[in-house]
Amino acid sequence: MGIARILSAVLFLSVLFVVTFPALLLADHHDGRIDTCRLPSDRGRCKASFERWYFNGRTCAKFIYGGCGGNGNKFPTEKACMKRCAKA
């Protein structure tokens, strides 16, 4: 009975590790959300031409957004980009 209990605990901890470790790698350390400011600019899959702003690791820069898809690192204004991504 002792071995079964140990194996059960090891299995539980292994599953817990496999489930939580990838989330820890992708999470923003401040609030648990994925840090969208670290994502690359992404035009998306559509062919429109909207001016948007993305954070490039140092500052906010313009890029052309296709109108659909893409990722969260797109903002309607430079001010919105800086507010979300610039570190004080």
Swiss-Prot record:
The keyword Ligase appears for this protein: no
SUPFAM superfamilies named among the record's database cross-references: BPTI-like (SSF57362)
PROSITE patterns membership: BPTI_KUNITZ_1, BPTI_KUNITZ_2
SMART domains, sorted: KU
Pfam families: Kunitz_BPTI
Residues carrying the site annotation May bind Kv1.x/KCNA: 39
Tissue occurrence: Expressed by the venom gland.
Example GO molecular function: serine-type endopeptidase inhibitor activity
PANTHER family: BPTI_KUNITZ INHIBITOR DOMAIN-CONTAINING PROTEIN, KUNITZ-TYPE PROTEASE INHIBITOR-RELATED
Protein name: Kunitz-type kappaPI-theraphotoxin-Hs1e
